[in-house]
């Protein structure tokens, strides 16, 4: 988490944009749309452009030389591939110089089933693959599918695995009521991880007030 030197409502648009991972993940996007959205994110000064891994070569030229980097997602949005498959995908995208972070999805079926050892072991191998190339890993939980105890326990899985961030939502979950990055969920995650890793809010951040509130939370 960034060390706050001022309140969010005192920040410039550029400073606020530096907290944003600009999502360009919808499967129906054409390559033309992906390029235009990538350009938009760079122009705004977003921290990263979050893209599907098949578009690395397409998007890389548009972030090179800018303050914006790429954040490819792996095994997204379900997190149910084999560990070997996840690791291979991470190794492919992590080789790009323009990659700052890689987003992966924890197997929330395992989480809901109480199989936390499997969750930790899976994440640990993914983290090792990313760190080998100097890339950070953000682990998405799908907090809307979990209760408080499951969220807290998964935070500990991520810490044990060496993850750099814990993250709330993919934005693609179905079958559950969408709440995303509520202040309540963010507070729970921050309590559990302490200074051992960072927390990233994603999903259902629809208003300026909500966005600024999350920044002020740290």
Task: Walk through the language-model features, giving the residues of each.
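A structural motif
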Residues: 46, 98-99, 134, 162-163, ...
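Glycine/Thr-rich beta-alpha phosphate-binding loop at enzyme active sites
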Residues: 106-113, 149-187
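Hydrophobic faces of well-ordered beta-strands that scaffold small-molecule active sites
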Residues: 16-24, 49-51, 68-75, 100-104, ...
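Active-site-proximal loop/turn and secondary-structure-junction residues that shape catalytic pockets
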Residues: 24, 53-55, 74-78, 106-110, ...
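Hydrophobic, well-structured mid-protein blocks that either form specific transmembrane helices
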Residues: 89, 94-142
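Generic N-terminal amphipathic, Lys/Arg-enriched alpha-helix
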Residues: 9-27, 36-41
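Active-site cofactor/substrate anionic-group-binding motifs, chiefly glycine-
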Residues: 43-101
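Catalytic cores of alpha/beta
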Residues: 60, 81-96, 146-157, 184-195, ...
